[in-house]
Curated annotation (Swiss-Prot):
Multimer. Interacts with EDS1. Interacts with SNC1 and RPS4. Interacts (via TPR domain) with SGT1 (via TPR domain). Interacts with the TCP transcription factors TCP8, TCP14, TCP15, TCP20, TCP22 and TCP23. SMART domains: TPR (SM00028). Residues 146-161 have a biased composition (Basic and acidic residues). It is a single-pass membrane protein. Negative regulator of effector-triggered immunity associated with the EDS1 resistance pathway. May localize its interactors to a microsomal membrane. May therefore negatively regulate RPS4 and SNC1 translocation to the nucleus. Contributes to the regulation of RPS2 and RPS4 protein levels and negatively regulates SNC1 stability. The modification N-acetylalanine is found at residue 2. This is Suppressor of RPS4-RLD 1. PANTHER family: SUPPRESSOR OF RPS4-RLD 1 (PTHR44749), TETRATRICOPEPTIDE-LIKE HELICAL DOMAIN-CONTAINING PROTEIN (PTHR44749:SF1). It comes from Arabidopsis thaliana.
């Protein structure tokens, strides 16, 4: 029976070959090879592929044949012909030479030997001809001509492969602030489509996706988490990759169709989401006889494919419609039409056609793969992976399908699976630059930075003009805070193509992160001259806002709000633009007022601030909060005086000293860019705090010598007089609000009693205000000024792990945090659920299992649900009392692989009260330590108790986390300011890899924190009294406008 079936199939094969119906012949060969692997049938299938000009399929079948029989001369001949057709002449010569040697070493068919010899001569002649023609061209023209022509020819002949083919086309799709991409993964890079406009794509935390519609592509920006910026350390806008808007060519071969992006030397490539090879291992030889109907069908299929390659999708669909009218279940035509639909973004129709093709021929690997790609473009990643996995059943270890599935796994944030798929793909296709790029992105997300860099560099090594790889590598370096390398990569992109707007956007981001906002504005303006994108508009608006050019800032914010979005994830930028426009108008109205009156916490409505912090839709804010007056009124109200903007010699001296001190705040850790604007802000704030505290201590000391210490201490506790803001009824203002408590310098000594009334909040408020004005788009606000949300525990959130992704800035603290969480669980024998219920862990040896857990995943599996544990801080002011520190949380988000492991610090009224009392006690202890016999001392040894008191106060501040954002930098700024007030200057840098705020958070005892920090801090202190010679900051930079000018003016 089996023999009869085989004979029947052989007869059918001969019939299809005679009628030139190569597609059906391939299907018969697939069937035969599924039953028995035959070298002859494999070569026959390669021959059929050759007739359809599916050269990459020819090569793969020949490679299979040569694995089974290293002396299969026919395989060498077919492979050599395929390589020649692809323009890979040097490879062809190597293959043919190897075949010729093999033929000579055995008793070979003389006809085949002569055919090999002739092919080899022809190939060598072609190479010689190319070299001669190149020698006659000018040095400048030769490289360009060779690059473009050879690539174009190669891709045209190579049009049947998927984007995952060995030429490594990139497949994009857009992702940014949300987790899901909203694009079509099908891209077109055929030479005739070169007239279409370039598309764009974005990349965040390393990921890249792309959206294409009617020749237009849109990029998105990534969202960022509260304390932690998207991994690149700069908050948002993390996706950069310029890609060509062209699509690859399409071909059909038996059960498959392929589309492949061509290599573009001037544009970043867009990986065509469709590709294929559906072979199950089968083939046979072919004769040639005519069969008019079959020839007609194949001819129309070829025409349809050609139309797809030309970008004429409507015509292609019309041709396929005619074929399907005659044969409604013809799988090749269904795949072709589905592909055309996919390019038109009619993804549902495309999926329907691919589904019908699968129903008609369940072994049609190409249909499974293309449907997977279409589903991935819709964000249906689970279903997409299922389809691609099914395709691998019919094409085991197919590099094309593995490449495709690796990309989908990457987009679905299954980075581990992505690495596995792409690594296997690259073992077979070592020249797949797209696979290397995505492998680099996946490794970066997993925190394997060395491997990520190597993968990106390998992609560039394969094609030095591959813009996508350069952009991803630039983004990678930016995330690690290696700005020099990032800028070098961007320069490489612009040398290849200076019209890539994403390169200017990324360079703008780097300059923004470095605090060079005016340079960022220049780059973003160039980017906007190329393409009007929401990313560039928003970022340029925020830069204008920071440097005090409020008219331009408002214009860009308005333009951001008016942009027609091509992806829902970008809506968050429009929300932020709304809030920041209001804040720009508020700041504009304050430019001529004293900087003390710049009071976001007191002037801005609590609801406005909450919605801004959470990036919520501003609808409720518009309805319930009084809006800022128009810009004309704000600017009229706050007209700047020229002397405010002038940098006098006196101001220049202060700025030099401020820059020197400010650099000391820099963390030497991955992800933290050296921001010169933030350094200057910190330096000026340090000096102001030192001046303010020094004056208060002098009064305290004078009073203590008069025997009035008791009254002074009492005064620090008493309720303070608030200075009313000058902006009642302004932007998002609450008419009944009051300013954050602040005390002017002059008022310190003007009190009737002559006693100091500085509180701990008076000490920290200047640092908070400077942080707010230095980067006005960061929501730095006091948490207790956030109305009802404060009661439900609004606070900061700092993730170390997000699913499988490791957050570059904070993951270094993961091991210590996990160890601390386990020790707390062992101590308490329980954890808390998301609903704040106690989860008992004292039974079933759970504690023992928890102590053996090495990852947060294992910890979550043992507990069995989302949970949190709270750290604590031993009180210094009230012996035996414990304050609630931060909450170490481990949760699993719906649809996300892995677990989110982070610290969250809620600030409820009860907790605020506890820390307020502790901070008051710590501040009083510091004042007592300095204002007694140590007052004015210039001996470091005599000031040790003062230093310890400063560190204890800093410890409680970090654990308190009273700000929605910015607690870390303001804490260290105040520490430096207090040391300077006591004549001690920190002259070194924070040790490499150390984040001082985490040192406080992960130590439950203040003494442990003090001992840890003093080991490197104290040896770096020197006595400095010359700082007192500088003019008071409140006098030199008295107005808000003068402060903004000081932060925005640099000699370079």
């Amino acid at each position: 029976m089996a023999t009869a079936t085989a004979t029947s199939e052989r007869f059918e094969l001969a019939k299809h070959c005679s009628s030139r119906n190569w597609s059906k012949a391939i299907r018969v060969l697939d069937s035969l090879l599924a039953k028995e692997s035959s070298i002859l049938d494999i070569c026959n299938r390669a021959f059929c592929y050759n007739q359809l000009e599916l050269h990459k399929h020819v090569i793969k079948d020949c490679d299979k044949a040569l694995l089974l029989e290293p002396f299969a001369i026919q395989a060498f001949i077919l492979k050599g012909r395929a390589l020649l057709a692809l323009g890979r002449k040097q490879e062809a010569v190597l293959v043919l030479e190897q075949g010729y040697k093999s033929a000579l070493q055995q008793t070979a068919d003389v006809k085949q030997l002569l055919e090999l010899e002739e092919l080899l001569k022809d190939a060598r002649r072609e190479i010689d001809g190319i070299l001669k023609s190149h020698a006659t061209e000018s040095p400048q023209e030769t490289p360009a001509y060779h690059s473009e022509k050879s690539d174009e020819k190669s891709d045209k002949l190579d049009n049947h492969e998927s984007g995952a083919s060995s030429n490594g086309n990139s497949h994009e799709s857009s992702s940014e602030l949300g987790e899901q991409s909203k694009i079509v993964s099908f891209s077109k890079v055929a030479s005739k489509a070169s007239k279409q406009s370039d598309g764009n794509s974005d990349l965040c935390n390393g990921s890249v996706y792309k959206e294409k519609e009617n020749g237009k592509c849109g990029s998105q920006i990534n969202g960022y988490y509260e304390s932690c910026k998207p991994c690149n350390g700069s908050d948002l806008h993390d996706n950069l990759a310029e890609s060509s808007d062209r699509f690859g060519e399409l071909s059909i071969n038996g059960n498959k169709i392929s589309i492949k992006s061509s290599k573009m030397s001037h544009k970043a490539e867009a990986r065509c989401g469709i590709s294929d090879e559906s072979r199950k291992n089968k083939k046979y030889t072919i004769a040639r006889i005519s069969g008019t109907h079959s020839i007609s069908v194949d001819f129309r299929l070829s025409r349809g494919i050609a139309q797809v390659n030309e970008g004429n999708y409507t015509k292609a669909i019309s041709i396929f419609d005619k074929v399907l009218k005659e044969e409604p279940t013809y799988p090749e035509a269904l795949i072709g039409r589905g592909t055309a639909y996919a390019f038109q973004r009619e993804l549902e129709s495309a999926i329907a056609d691919f589904t019908k093709a699968i129903q008609s021929n369940p072994a049609a690997s190409e249909a499974w793969k293309r449907r997977g790609q279409a589903r991935a473009a819709l964000g249906e990643y689970v279903e997409a992976v299922e389809d691609l996995t099914k395709a691998l059943v019919f094409e085991p270890n197919s590099p094309d399908v593995l490449h495709e599935r690796g990309i989908v796994n990457f987009k679905s944030k299954d980075f581990t699976a992505a690495v596995k798929d792409l690594s296997i793909c690259l073992k077979q296709e070592k020249d797949n630059k797209s696979a290397y790029t995505y492998l680099g992105l996946a490794f970066a997300s997993l925190g394997e930075y060395k491997k990520a860099e190597e993968a990106h560099l390998k992609s560039i090594q394969l094609d030095s003009n591959y813009l996508e790889a350069w952009l991803h590598l630039a983004q990678f370096y930016q995330e690690l805070a290696d700005h020099c390398k990032a800028l070098e990569c961007i320069e490489q992109v612009l040398q290849v193509d200076n019209r890539v707007w994403k390169a200017y956007h990324l360079r703008g981001l780097v300059f923004h992160g470095l605090g060079e906002h005016r340079k960022a504005i220049q780059e973003l303006s160039i980017g906007l001259s190329i393409e009007n994108t929401i990313e560039c508009l928003y970022l340029r608006g925020s830069c204008y806002h920071a440097v005090g050019e409020y008219r331009d800032a408002v214009k860009d914010y308005d333009a951001t709000v008016d942009v027609e979005l091509d992806a829902v994830e970008k809506f968050v930028l429009q929300c932020l633009a709304f809030y920041q426009k209001e804040l720009a108008l508020y700041t504009a109205s304050k430019v001529s007022s004293e900087f003390l009156c710049f009071d976001i916490d007191g002037d801005i409505d609590p609801m406005f601030k909450e919605y801004w912090c959470k990036r919520l839709h501003p609808k409720n804010v518009c309805e319930k909060v009084y809006r800022q007056p128009p810009l004309r009124e704000s600017l009229k109200k706050g007209k700047l005086k020229k002397q405010d903007l002038a940098i006098t010699k006196q101001k220049a001296n202060i700025l030099r000293f401020a820059d020197l001190i400010g650099k000391r705040i820099q963390y030497d850790c991955p992800g933290f860019l050296p921001n010169k604007r933030q350094h200057r802000m910190a330096g000026l704030a340090v000096i102001e705090i030192a001046q303010k505290v020094s004056k208060a201590w002098r009064i305290e000391w004078r009073n203590s010598t008069k025997g009035t210490t008791k009254n002074g201490k009492k005064n620090r506790r008493r309720e303070r007089t608030n200075i009313l803001s000058q902006n009642r009824g302004g932007a998002g203002c609450s008419s009944s609000s009051f300013s954050e408590t602040s005390t002017g310098y002059a008022s310190l000594e003007d009190r009737s009693s002559g006693r100091s009334i500085l509180s701990w909040q008076d000490v920290y408020s200047p640092a908070v205000r400077w942080r707010q004005i230095s980067e006005p788009c960061d929501p730095v606000v006091w948490v207790n000024k956030l109305s009802e949300e404060f009661n439900s525990g609004f606070g900061s959130h700092t993730p170390m792990v997000l699913g499988q992704a490791k957050v570059v800035r904070y993951f270094p603290n993961y091991e210590r945090t996990l160890t601390l969480a386990k020790s707390i669980i062992k101590d308490k024998l329980s954890v808390r659920s998301k609903k704040d219920k106690v989860i008992d862990l004292s039974k079933d040896e759970k504690i023992e299992k928890i102590m053996r857990a090495e990852t947060c995943d294992e910890l979550h599996n043992i507990v069995g649900e989302d949970f949190w544990v709270a750290t604590w801080c031993d009180s210094t002011g009230s012996e035996g009392k414990r304050l609630e520190g931060t909450r170490i949380t481990c949760i699993q988000k719906p649809g996300r692989l892995g677990y989110d492991f982070s610290i969250r610090t809620p600030c409820t009224p009860a907790r605020w009260s506890d820390f307020d009392e502790e901070m008051t006690s710590a501040w009083e202890a510091l004042c007592t330590a300095y204002c007694g016999e140590n007052y004015g001392s210039t001996e470091l040894d005599a000031l040790e108790t003062v230093r310890d008191a400063i560190l204890r106060m800093t410890y409680y501040w970090y654990n308190f986390m009273p700000l929605a954002r910015g607690t870390a930098v303001t804490g260290f700024v105040v520490l430096l300011g207090l040391l300077l007030a006591a004549n001690m200057e920190f002259t070194e840098t924070i040790p490499k890899g150390l984040q001082i705020d985490w040192e406080a958070i992960l130590n439950v005892e203040p003494g442990s924190f003090v001992d840890s920090v003093k080991s490197w801090l104290y040896p770096s202190l020197k006595i400095n009294t010359s700082w007192r010679d500088h003019t008071e900051i409140s006098s030199a930079f008295s107005t808000t406008g003068a402060v903004v000018a000081a932060l925005s003016t640099y000699n370079d």
